[in-house]
Amino acid sequence: MPKQKTHRASAKRFKRTGSGGLKRFRAYTSHRFHGKTKKQRRHLRKASMVHSGDYKRIKAMLTRLK
């Protein structure tokens, strides 16, 4: 039986935390900032944790991620 491979696109977008959670960065950060307030832009810089409903599916793609 072959080993399951890590989904490389997902590996570039998520990092595992020390407690086993998954850290992600926010969407809507590449352009069109003139339509966003300073507060929105500031909050978009912060990382966020993966929601519990998505955790199981994303974890399956990142089987061998350290």
UniProtKB/Swiss-Prot annotation:
Keywords: Ribonucleoprotein, Ribosomal protein. One of its GO terms (cellular component) is cytosolic large ribosomal subunit. PROSITE patterns: RIBOSOMAL_L35 (PS00936). The keyword Ribosomal protein applies. One of its GO terms (molecular function) is structural constituent of ribosome. Residues 1-16 have a biased composition (Basic residues). Residues 1-21 are annotated as: Disordered. Pfam families: Ribosomal_L35p (PF01632). GO terms for biological process: translation. PANTHER family: 54S RIBOSOMAL PROTEIN BL35M, LARGE RIBOSOMAL SUBUNIT PROTEIN BL35M. Belongs to the bacterial ribosomal protein bL35 family. This is Large ribosomal subunit protein bL35. It comes from Streptococcus pneumoniae serotype 4 (strain ATCC BAA-334 / TIGR4).
